A protein has these predicted regions:
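Extracytoplasmic ligand-binding site segments that recognize negatively charged/polar headgroups
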Residues: 24-31, 67-207
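Generic anion/oxyanion-binding catalytic loop in active/binding sites
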Residues: 4-5, 19, 60, 134
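Sec/Tat signal peptide C-region and signal peptidase I cleavage site
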Residues: 10-15
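Early extracytoplasmic/lumenal segment of secretory-pathway proteins
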Residues: 16-81
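Bacterial N-terminal signal peptides
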Residues: 1-9
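Short alpha-helical segments and helix-capping/turn motifs at coil-helix boundaries
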Residues: 6, 56-58, 108-110
């Protein structure tokens, strides 16, 4: 997971007195980043929070008339795609030498147009109280999620808008192979009650 530093065509935030931030992490993180940067710099931050897939689509739509300055957060692949398509500007962070090797590899793969700032793992979130109420055992592996007991009880993000959902599919393909992975997704579908726009949606639903 990473942050793209500067969107291609973005202007100087200090010169304009404002910065347009596209943020693809939890809205609470986005708000904290915007608030603290604004306090430290005096630059007004206009923040838009969307999933990685949606933000990539927005950047493509705005390619001829870029409106964003910085894209922070989300999964790595959409940032690499944006870098390859020339949607991101090249930038060298001053602290590049202090970053973890995986973060630097992201920077190198993006040819200096994106850099890793945090990493995370895909996992399952559940509400213990609801599981107890419905006499369900907490899922411990991917196979558990397709059990009939969970029919209509699961939410997952939509890969058309969410980078997290794309990572889930890519993970399943690596674990099972393409054919078995998509057969698994087909088996999982009856247990899904909603496909959310972003990867944070399902977690909020069980909180």
């Amino acid at each position: 997971v990473l942050a793209a530093i500067m969107l291609a065509g973005g202007g100087s935030a200090s010169a304009q007195g404002q910065l347009n931030l596209y943020c693809s992490v939890q809205v609470e993180w986005c708000q904290a980043i915007a608030t603290n940067f604004q306090k430290a710099s005096g630059v007004t931050v206009n923040m838009t929070q969307k999933g990685s897939g949606e933000t990539l689509a927005q950047n493509r739509a705005e390619a001829q008339n870029p409106r964003g300055d910085v894209w922070f957060g989300g999964t790595g692949d959409p940032h690499l795609v944006a870098a390859e398509e020339g949607l991101l500007a090249e930038y060298k962070p001053g602290a590049l030498g202090d970053l973890q090797p995986w973060a630097v590899r992201q920077y190198e793969a993006a040819k200096g147009r994106s850099v890793g700032v945090y990493s995370g793992a895909v996992g399952f979130g559940f509400n213990k109280e609801l599981l107890q109420k419905k006499n369900l055992t907490a899922p411990a592996c991917w196979a558990d999620l397709i059990k009939p007991d969970f029919k209509g009880e699961i939410q997952v993000a939509n890969p058309n808008s969410s980078g997290t959902a794309y990572v889930i599919i890519a993970t399943l393909v690596q674990l099972m192979g393409e054919d078995k992975a998509f057969a698994y997704m087909k088996s999982l579908h009856p247990n899904i009650n909603a496909y959310t726009r972003s990867g944070t949606g399902p977690i909020k639903a069980v909180a």
